[in-house]
A protein has these predicted regions:
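Non-catalytic, solvent-exposed segments at the cell envelope interface
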Residues: 1-176
Length: 176
């Protein structure tokens, strides 16, 4: 209706109730931990995503999560280049503040470095998360324009990304 894209980003260091498993993968207990650990208690694939989905739902007061898509960072250059590059502002982080500069169009490995680099400052995860939100919003805008111009492009992109992705959302749900 508003034709706007909103991104809800959850910092990997957010503390919430997560299920804890033993070394054999058996449920041990529920405790408070970093939300990113929920994924680590799984197999790195569907099991990890289901456990992360549960932790996110717990964080959001049992809000049902209808689906997930975990995409390996190695897919970023391919996705980025498939839409002709993504334009984002230059971002610098200093003294706890993000400063925005001139726009830059990221291609290939530059896109990967933009969304992946975290640094080692105390609040580096927050800075990276902000960069990822900016990037994702710009990417989604480009993808929507691409789909409007050629509706089949979303199917092609989905198929290209599939080897890098674990999801419970099938291509028909993406296209309709």
């Amino acid at each position: 209706e508003t034709k706007q894209i909103s991104v809800v980003a959850i910092n990997r260091n957010t503390m919430t109730q997560i299920n804890v498993y033993d070394t054999e993968g058996n449920f041990d207990h529920t405790g408070v931990g970093q939300i990113c650990l929920a994924h680590g208690y799984g197999d790195g694939m569907e099991e990890s995503c289901e456990r992360e989905k549960k932790a996110v739902s717990n964080l959001l007061y049992s809000l049902p999560i209808s689906g997930y898509a975990a995409i390996n960072m190695g897919a970023v250059p391919m996705i980025n280049d498939a839409v002709g590059g993504v334009t984002v502002p230059r971002m610098t982080y200093q003294d706890g503040k993000i400063e925005y500069g001139k726009d830059q169009t990221l291609m290939g490995e530059d896109a990967y470095r933009f969304v992946h680099y975290r640094g080692n400052d105390f609040d580096a995860a927050t800075y990276r998360l902000e960069k990822q939100k900016v990037y994702l919003k710009a990417l989604m805008t480009k993808m929507l324009a691409s789909v409007k111009a050629n509706p089949a492009s979303i199917v092609n992109l989905y198929q290209s990304v599939s080897p890098y992705m674990v999801t419970d959302v099938d291509v028909s749900e993406v296209t309709y």
